[in-house]
A protein has these predicted regions:
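Rossmann-like adenosine-cofactor binding region
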Residues: 237-315
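NAD(P)-binding Rossmann-fold cofactor-contacting core
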Residues: 210-231
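Glycine-rich adenosine-cofactor-binding loop
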Residues: 175, 186-207, 219-224
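Aromatic (phenylalanine/tyrosine) cluster motif
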Residues: 2, 22-25, 35
Length: 376
């Protein structure tokens, strides 16, 4: 059952029985539909969308900080259900997703904006994000972002959210949606290449989704690596700080790569290291992977074919792509077919994912009366 309250959903991993098969996870379409209906109704109850405002009434925007958003503790199930609902709604013309707009100055900065809108829930979301590797030397985070929500019918501004939190939850949520269909259900060992924010959010999601027993962590920074290992141990998992990327990846059931992008990054990961049956999610545009090793995968899914067609440089050779996430969720293409297939999800980030998570957080914050209201 999908959980909509603000309490953190904690899976009882001791009750999970590992299946020595490649059975896909239940798609639970009717539950996702019910979830979406309740989400939409609660949004109507807590936003401006349930009333016609007169000319004298002031518009108030709800500001949701990173600290507050973390306190909402959205469940993994509610995150994936929200994303799956919007992916299905694309086929009924209730959701619109624009390809991301990107600016990449020659000094290594990465500037990006995404736009998505839906009729159910009645929300439009715009995210602006800036990444600068030089921020580290300034004592700043490398990424800053904001998400703005508007009513998709009236255009009334609704909220501004910390985009870093939305991006972390959305990215892990997209990976989880793909993993449900592309990974073996009995996956027990997860390898993390890159140990920052994305690794932490993926650990939390995948620990709920799979009967994990062990993680392996490899990254440049010992502080982040050790923090990830501690998080795994707090979940009751064995944690190994791997000395090399190959050591981490070999014999892992799940591989999560979230290597920071920079002009200096050179490929250092080889898909030929993967064991039969492994699933890889690449949140880093597949940049750290040797392109010549990609044909090892039996099935590669990307986030969005329409978006990919407009990108200057493809994530992977187009002839290696089996389809995108919307087609996968709508069962227009198959996921894993055998227990020994090597599968991968490679993605840039999908605007409707930002919409799904921001709308979900907005719903919970409104229902709980949280956030700072600011006059427009």
């Amino acid at each position: 059952m999908y959980i909509e309250n603000s309490a953190l959903h904690q899976s009882d991993r001791s009750k999970k029985t590992a299946q020595h098969c490649f059975t896909s996870f239940p798609l639970q379409t009717h539950k996702a539909t019910t979830f979406a209906s309740r989400l939409s109704q609660r949004l109507l109850n807590c936003s401006h969308t349930n009333k016609i405002m007169n000319a004298q009434e002031s518009v108030k925007i709800r500001f949701l900080s990173h600290r507050l958003l973390k306190q909402l503790q959205l469940s993994s199930e509610s995150v994936t259900a929200s994303i799956e609902h919007l992916l299905r709604s694309r086929r009924t013309a209730q959701v619109w997703n624009a390809p991301k707009a990107v600016i990449t100055p020659p000094d290594g900065r990465y500037m990006m904006a995404t736009l998505a809108a839906a009729d159910n829930p009645q929300i439009l979301a715009v995210k602006s994000l800036m990444l600068n590797p030089a921020n580290t030397a300034r004592g700043l985070k490398s990424i800053y972002a904001l998400v703005t929500l508007l009513d998709s019918d009236t255009g009334i501004p609704l909220a501004v959210l910390d985009g870093g939190w939305v991006t972390a939850i959305r990215t892990a949520g997209l990976s989880a949606v793909a993993a449900k269909r592309l990974a073996n259900a009995d996956a027990a060992i997860a390898a993390f290449i890159g140990c920052g924010v994305q690794a932490q959010s993926h650990l939390n999601n995948f620990a709920d989704l799979f009967p994990l027993k062990e993680i392996r962590a490899f990254g440049r920074g010992a502080e982040n690596r050790d923090a990830l290992c501690r998080s795994a141990e707090n979940l009751g998992l064995a944690a190994i700080a791997s000395k090399t990327a190959q050591e981490a990846v070999q014999n892992a059931d799940l591989v999560i790569t979230s290597v920071s992008l920079s002009p200096a990054l050179k490929p250092f990961l080889d898909a030929r290291w993967l064991k039969p049956g492994a699933f890889v999610t690449m949140t880093d545009l597949a940049a750290p992977w040797f392109a010549e090793s990609m044909p090892v995968f039996d099935r590669i899914i990307i986030d969005d074919r329409e978006q990919e067609a407009q990108m200057q440089k493809p994530l992977v050779r187009p002839d290696l792509v089996s389809g995108d996430l919307t087609a996968l969720v709508n069962e227009e293409i198959t996921g894993r077919s055998t227990a020994t297939e090597r599968t991968a999800f490679i993605f840039r980030g999908l605007a409707l994912g930002d919409l799904a998570i921001a709308a979900l957080a907005f719903q919970h914050a409104c229902a709980d009366g949280q956030g700072t209201l600011v006059d427009l």
